[in-house]
Amino acid sequence: MSILIVDDEKEIADLVDVILRNEGYETLKYYDSLAAQKEIEKNNSIDLAILDVMMPGIDGFALCSKIREQYTYPIIMLTARVGDVDKITGLTIGADDYVTKPFNPLELLARVRAQLRRYKNYSAAKPQERETFESKGLYINRQEHTVSLFDEPVILTPTEFEILWLLCENAGNVVSSEKIFETVWKEDYLDSNNTVMVHIRRIRDKLKEPPRNPKIIKTVWGVGYKVEK
């Protein structure tokens, strides 16, 4: 698997590179975000990107947006800032996960593995589960990993797809933010975590939902989200 690493801090980029190569991953390492952008434009064999947020010239957010114009592979952002602003911004424009500097190499590796596993296996449906869902013009095929709305294709990232499928799989029932987070990310949920909310907003945007009156993904305030049968 090929992983793109972009960080203008040479020590950080080199550390990430060593961590991943020691685990058998192929890496593409860039200290220059402009050179990385050119790589993104021409290389369609990247499986995951690790992007630093604060870089001169083209920052990590701009690179993330550039990737999302063409690809759905996972993106992990690196940030030196502890607050939620960077995290929410990154998730809103298409990032899948965040790691705060300084980081534990084992944590970074675990997040990389989790994202790659989700990316490579998202289309594998369990035999006991139904494989399609249809309601109000929305059609989802889990086996083919396709989504359409009134026959128009909707392009979702693997994480967005898993969230939408979880809601549709439980259509008619409210699914809590905690349940969504722990099912999709397989980590303990914190009450202050805005990750689910930001991903729901992105999915709604792609489904062209009216912000004040969404028709497909309903918010049940204080409880969670649901899709009607």
Per-range role (PLM):
Residues S65, E69, P74-E134:
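Basic, amphipathic DNA-recognition helix from helix-turn-helix-like DNA-binding domains
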Residues D7:
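Conserved acidic carboxylate
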Residues D14-N22:
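Charged docking surfaces used in two-component/phosphorelay signaling
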Residues S2, A114-F161, W165-V174, E178:
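Short, Lys/Arg-enriched segments at the junction into DNA-binding effector domains
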Residues R130, I155, I200, R204-K229:
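DNA-binding patch around the recognition helix
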Residues G24-D32, E39:
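Short hydrophobic/Thr-rich beta-strand motif most characteristic of the beta2 strand and flanking loop
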Residues N44-I50, M55:
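Active-site beta3 strand of CheY-like receiver
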Residues D32, D59-A62, D86:
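Acidic catalytic/metal-coordinating carboxylates
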